[in-house]
């Protein structure tokens, strides 16, 4: 908000006889006795006893636990942080929970960090309310609408905090972060909410008259809405003669019952726009007016008279109508519309129809063209019956036309086609993983292990630190245990050592970025695998892969996959990381490069491989149990 808007908010608050500023409110809060216990503070704030759990919302999807720890740990000792994620995609849901050891630290975090930007988005912090009945209670919760777009969460909080302690405050926004011009404020007490409604409802905020009222739950609103629909009194009239005045408009509807209000929409020049609203005193009068006047011709025009609807309701009805038409259209062309591709450039719509005409009655045939009118090489042919379409597919698929074999199949919508393709790829990958599991998971990737023999340098494919090996005794130590690691040492006279598997043009980058002195290695914390922060880009890795022999390509890709799999912390079996790496190396090289560059894609493939590995282990254990029996 600008300084002028902030001043206007302060002036509005002064009109309400709210003289205390934020500093004065803080000073008033500070009058609480110093020996007040955390338990008493918890009760006064409406949160659970000794609670130190905070809800942090409005987070950027890129914010993780480490980011939040850096922000919240200076306030006090943090016991735990959890960013809530989608169970399938693992993407952040935009909110998290931060737990402190002390209640006072939670209060301080709310006071100092609330509405502060985190990675470009102002966060919203409040006490975590674990009791669902308390969260859903309407006591103390108010609804504000017709807000100025410039009013954000902080401005709303500053405006309404004068009436009592606020538990949560939010301005609703769209997917682009723009205000929807309404919001909610949840007070600790119902009295504070009543005071806010009494003082702010109808008041001007940033030159807009706002409405403030008690919040009504969606369930109650829908119940009330259905009741209002069944007993409507307000009707909408359109296609009215533009020469109609308000007096003539009222005279038209007055015979049906007592009118409480009437409105005829006009433009800037005061001329009628041809529609308006009439509100009757009782439901029966409104129903009678609709029945008598709808579709009646007045001054040469058929007018429409019906129940007045809210914009949201109208949009929902239009959406349903559109969906019904779309489904009807799909049903009409189901099994009769053919997709034809690999067409010669000389084939136009007429020629296409001529080729398919022997198989039945064609309702339409069209070759798709670009802006210049040139054929795109594909088109559509629609028959009248599924039998004709099936016959055309049987006869015309792979037939040579002008030296090119046609592809003919039933036409599909783009979204259905994409969905089927994704399912086919996923099924193929799962089958590959299952086949690997059924065959005993061959092709286990064995990461290199080196013990620093004098004069010997490890053939690490990218110059990184060697990854933990498949030795069961070392792997069984569990997560967070030290792995043996030896860093490559420089050659004679401090010269970099050539790295096995890397073309000469890439040698300098890998040696220069990853050589470390032995002393620096000894100071390195020993807690398992640490990802290399000087990773080469996907483009460089692709160049490396293309320039080495075939038998070395999978080795280099394996050295990229293995640490990424270990870093997930889910491959805890002694041989799990190596087995899963071996399974994932069964993918095409380009697919591996893609999933190394895309965490979501990697997670999907990793979860499939992990599931296959676990199923294999279960079947193996069951087989061993049967043999012992």
Swiss-Prot record:
Domain RRM: 52-130, 140-217, 233-310, 336-413
SMART domains recorded: PolyA, RRM, RRM_1
PABC domain location: 537-618
Gene Ontology biological-process entries: mRNA 3'-end processing; mRNA transport; nuclear-transcribed mRNA poly(A) tail shortening; regulation of nuclear-transcribed mRNA poly(A) tail shortening; regulation of translational initiation
Bias (Polar residues): 1-11, 505-517
Localization: Cytoplasm; Nucleus
Low complexity composition bias: residue spans: 20-36
Keyword Zinc-finger tagged: no
PROSITE patterns for this protein: PABC, RRM
InterPro entries: Nucleotide-bd_a/b_plait_sf, PABP-dom, PABP_1234, PABP_HYD_C, PABP_RRM1, RBD_domain_sf, RRM2_I_PABPs, RRM_dom
An example Gene Ontology molecular-function term: promoter-specific chromatin binding
UniProt keyword Lyase present: no
Renumbered residue ranges of the record's region Disordered: 1-48, 503-534
Pfam families: MLLE, RRM_1
Keywords: Cytoplasm, mRNA processing, mRNA transport, Nucleus, Repeat, RNA-binding, Translation regulation, Transport
Gene Ontology CC annotations of this record: cytoplasmic stress granule; cytosol; nucleus; post-mRNA release spliceosomal complex; ribonucleoprotein complex; ribosome
Role played: Binds the poly(A) tail of mRNA. Appears to be an important mediator of the multiple roles of the poly(A) tail in mRNA biogenesis, stability and translation. In the nucleus, involved in both mRNA cleavage and polyadenylation. Is also required for efficient mRNA export to the cytoplasm. Acts in concert with a poly(A)-specific nuclease (PAN) to affect poly(A) tail shortening, which may occur concomitantly with either nucleocytoplasmic mRNA transport or translational initiation.
Family under the similarity heading: Belongs to the polyadenylate-binding protein type-1 family.
Name by which UniProt lists this protein: Polyadenylate-binding protein, cytoplasmic and nuclear
Protein's organism: Candida albicans (strain SC5314 / ATCC MYA-2876)
Gene label: PAB1
């Amino acid at each position: 908000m600008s300084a002028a808007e902030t001043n206007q908010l302060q002036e509005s608050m002064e009109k309400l006889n709210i003289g205390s500023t934020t500093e004065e409110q803080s000073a008033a809060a500070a009058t609480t006795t110093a020996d007040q216990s955390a338990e008493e503070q918890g009760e006064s704030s409406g949160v659970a006893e000794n609670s130190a759990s905070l809800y942090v919302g409005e987070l950027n999807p890129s914010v993780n636990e480490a980011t939040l720890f850096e922000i919240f740990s200076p306030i006090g000792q943090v016991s735990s942080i959890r960013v809530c994620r989608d169970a399938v995609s693992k993407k952040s849901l935009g909110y998290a929970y931060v737990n402190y050891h002390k209640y006072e630290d939670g209060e301080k975090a709310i006071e100092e960090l609330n509405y502060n930007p985190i990675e470009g988005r102002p966060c919203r912090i409040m006490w975590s309310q674990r009791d669902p009945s308390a969260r859903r209670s309407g006591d103390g919760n108010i609804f504000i609408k017709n807000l100025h777009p410039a009013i954000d969460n902080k401005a709303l909080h500053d405006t309404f905090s004068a009436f009592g302690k606020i538990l949560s405050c939010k301005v609703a926004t769209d997917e682009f972060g723009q205000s929807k011009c309404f919001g909610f404020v949840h007070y600790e007490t119902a009295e504070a909410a009543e005071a806010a409604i009494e003082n702010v409802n109808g008041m001007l905020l940033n030159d807009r008259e706002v409405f403030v009222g008690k919040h009504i739950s969606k369930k109650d609103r829908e119940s009330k809405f259905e009741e209002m629909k069944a007993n409507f009194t307000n009707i909408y009239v359109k296609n009215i003669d533009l020469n109609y005045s308000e007096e003539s408009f009222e005279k038209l509807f007055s015979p049906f019952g007592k009118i409480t209000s009437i409105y005829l929409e006009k433009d800037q020049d005061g001329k009628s726009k041809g529609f308006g609203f009439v509100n009757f005193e009782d439901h029966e009068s409104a129903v009678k007016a609709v029945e008598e006047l709808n579709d009646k011709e007045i001054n040469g025009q058929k007018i429409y008279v019906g129940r007045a609807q809210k914009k949201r309701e109208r949009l929902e009805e239009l959406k349903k109508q559109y969906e019904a038409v779309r489904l009807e259209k799909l049903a009409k062309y189901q099994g009769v519309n053919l997709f034809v591709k690999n067409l010669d450039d000389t084939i136009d719509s007429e020629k296409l129809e001529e080729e398919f005409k022997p198989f039945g009655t064609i309702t339409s045939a069209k070759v798709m063209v670009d802006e210049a009118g040139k054929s795109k090489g594909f088109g559509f042919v629609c028959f009248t019956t599924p039998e004709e379409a099936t016959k055309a597919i049987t006869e015309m698929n792979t037939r040579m036309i002008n030296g090119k074999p046609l592809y003919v199949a039933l036409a599909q919508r783009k979204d259905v086609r994409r969905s089927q393709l994704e399912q086919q790829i996923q099924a193929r990958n799962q089958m590959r993983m299952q086949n690997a599991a059924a065959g005993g998971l061959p092709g286990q990737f064995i990461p290199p292990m080196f013990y620093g023999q004098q004069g010997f340098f490890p053939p690490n494919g990218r110059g990184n630190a060697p990854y933990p090996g498949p030795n069961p005794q070392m792997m069984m130590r569990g997560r967070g245990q030290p792995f043996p690691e030896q860093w490559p040492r420089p050659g004679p006279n401090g010269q970099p050592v050539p790295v096995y598997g890397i073309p000469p043009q890439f040698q300098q980058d890998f040696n220069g970025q990853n050589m470390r002195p032995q002393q620096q290695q000894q100071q390195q914390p020993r807690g398992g695998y640490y990802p290399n922060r000087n990773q080469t880009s996907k483009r460089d890795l692709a160049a490396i892969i293309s320039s080495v022999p075939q038998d070395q390509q999978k080795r280099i890709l394996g050295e990229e996959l293995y640490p990424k799999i270990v870093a997930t912390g889910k491959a805890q079996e002694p041989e799990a990381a190596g087995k899963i790496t071996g399974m994932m190396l069964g993918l095409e090289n380009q697919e591996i490069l893609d999933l190394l560059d895309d965490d979501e894609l990697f997670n999907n493939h990793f979860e499939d491989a992990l599931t296959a590995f676990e199923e294999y282990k279960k079947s193996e254990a069951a087989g061993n149990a049967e043999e012992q029996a």
